[in-house]
Amino acid sequence: ELTGSSKPKGYKFDGRSIADLLKPGAKVEWADRFLVTDSQRVRDPIKWRKSSVMSQRWRLVNGEELYDIEKDPGQEKNLAKENLQQVKKMRAFYESWWAELEPTFAETTELHVGHKDHSVVSLTSHDWIQEVGTPWNQGHIRSKSPLRKGKEGKHLGHWALKVLKTGKYRIEVRRWPSESGKAINQELEPGGDVPGASKAFRAQVGQGIEARSATLRLNGKDLQTQAVRSETQSIVFETQLTKGKHKLSPYFSVPEGELGCYYAIISTP
């Protein structure tokens, strides 16, 4: 709309255009409406989990608590019992919103590789799919998460890939990002701390992992294994990938068991 482009045929936009609101001096009639926000942070969405249905005036929190945000921006007084009709209306909107989205929950968001315009794809552990929480920040990665002391670990996460073209692919796996210049088994020295309520991730020591080898696991099968030497920064595998869906889960063999490779770079040779 802002660029003058036409809408793709059959495409349904979600929401309402704010283009008119962006015009200098515009006076736009803007009807009150409901919006939904939630914070799931789980693999499979849970109804009403950490949710809020919002209007200009009202906030319905977790489907149970109602606050008048204009008079009570701190959300201290729950008015649900005094405004049952408002709660009912906002719950009905959420139910409709959930019903529209629920059929998509079983769909996996896949990372595309093999596209002619993107011959190199970089992956990080943030996109692992697994039952337990993924190591999504440097605090996790520096501390070898999700390994636990005294417990033999097995790498249970995977990257969901959609291979667009059958062929031979180069898969480079790393413990540290390539920009670090660090070897797989090398400790990462802490950086300077920054002001804040807690210790910055960069101020933590990046632990050595004592990896003996790296293994390429694809669709639950271990295909190749290579030794990790003291100076090795990355391990490179070459393998044939067929067009379609795949689960990629390379790992390092460490004293505690299996530690997923936090970084991978996939390219066509």
Language model features: what each stretch is:
Residues I141-V163, E179, S234-F237:
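Short beta-strands within extracellular/lumenal beta-sheet-rich domains
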Residues E1, M54-Q85, K89-M90, S125-E131, ...:
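A short aromatic-rich beta-strand->coil structural motif
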Residues T3, I69, N83-K154, K168-R170, ...:
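Catalytic cores of secreted or luminal carbohydrate-active enzymes
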Residues Q240-G244:
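Surface-exposed, short loops/turns at beta-strand junctions within beta-sandwich domains
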Residues E1-K71, Q86-K89, T104, K116-D117, ...:
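C-terminal cap/loop subdomain of S1 sulfatases and analogous C-terminal strand-loop tails that border
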Residues S253-P269:
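Exposed low-complexity, polar/acidic, P/S/T/G-rich flexible segments that act as propeptides
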Residues V163-G206, L248, F252:
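A short beta-strand element within beta-rich, extracytoplasmic domains
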Residues G167-Y169, E210-A214, G260-Y262:
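Short beta-strand/loop motifs in extracellular/secreted proteins, especially
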